[in-house]
Amino acid sequence: MPNYKLLYFNMRGRAEIIRYIFAYLDIKYEDHRIEQADWPKIKPTLPFGKIPVLEVEGLTLHQSLAIARYLTKNTDLAGKTELEQCQVDAVVDTLDDFMSLFPWAEENQDLKERTFNDLLTRQAPHLLKDLDTYLGDKEWFIGNYVTWADFYWDICSTTLLVLKPDLLGIYPRLVSLRNKVQAIPAISAWILKRPQTKL
């Protein structure tokens, strides 16, 4: 088993999907969390100057979803068939497209607040309606078993609920999916032991 070192800020953010996958697959890794004050000196040393990165076998891998795909490849978390793998990727990319619209680093607070409000009140309902329709009466997004698309939904929706606690009020099936992910023993154990951060 390779030695893994995950580098990210002390927050869930874009690294949490990697941590969920490590937890579920029971893979040991170093969860290295850096302070914001140290970021300016660390940034120039990394590929493309972004985190998270995963150090493995002398390589520094970047892009959280690429890392997630690397870790889930050849496991059922990625989907059992090529068609299911495409469906998993499509749900993940749909969620990521939306989450990437948020101007997390915007310094103009008025603009940031207006944009967040627009995304949460006007655009999120369209996404949630589509996700609810896609899920339907199934237990999981794809197939009859958990995939990392379900993990990513739980992670993204946790952040969205911090920003707008009533967001899922009319989507009990999406809430139920969150609950099912969080009830998986390995995920539940991780949630209990992880550092408590807002985002």
Curated annotation (Swiss-Prot):
Residue stretches making up the GST C-terminal domain: 81-199
GO-annotated cellular components: cytoplasm
Keywords: Cytoplasm, Fatty acid biosynthesis, Fatty acid metabolism, Isomerase, Lipid biosynthesis, Lipid metabolism, Prostaglandin biosynthesis, Prostaglandin metabolism, Transferase
Binding site for glutathione: Y8, R14, W39, G49, K50, I51, Q63, S64
Tissue specificity as recorded in UniProt: Highly expressed in spleen and bone marrow. Lower levels of expression in small intestine, colon, liver, pancreas and skin. Not detected in brain, heart, lung or kidney (at protein level).
Co-factor remark: Glutathione is required for the prostaglandin D synthase activity.
Primary location group: cytoplasm
Location(s) in or outside the cell: Cytoplasm
Ranges where the GST N-terminal domain occurs: 2-79
Cofactors: glutathione
Gene Ontology MF term list: calcium ion binding; glutathione transferase activity; magnesium ion binding; prostaglandin-D synthase activity; protein homodimerization activity
Record EC number: 5.3.99.2, 2.5.1.18
Domain of life: Eukaryota
Signal peptide: none
PROSITE patterns assigned: GST_CTER, GST_NTER
Effect annotated for changing K112E: Significant reduction of protein expression levels. Significantly reduces prostaglandin D synthase and moderately reduces glutathione-conjugating activities
BP GO annotations: glutathione metabolic process; negative regulation of male germ cell proliferation; prostaglandin biosynthetic process; prostaglandin metabolic process; response to nematode; response to selenium ion
Function comment: Bifunctional enzyme which catalyzes both the conversion of PGH2 to PGD2, a prostaglandin involved in smooth muscle contraction/relaxation and a potent inhibitor of platelet aggregation, and the conjugation of glutathione with a wide range of aryl halides and organic isothiocyanates. Also exhibits low glutathione-peroxidase activity towards cumene hydroperoxide.
Record-stated family: Belongs to the GST superfamily. Sigma family.
Description of how the protein assembles with itself and partners: Homodimer.
PANTHER family, per database record: GLUTATHIONE S-TRANSFERASE, HEMATOPOIETIC PROSTAGLANDIN D SYNTHASE
Record-given protein name: Hematopoietic prostaglandin D synthase
Species of provenance: Rattus norvegicus
Gene name for this UniProt entry: Hpgds
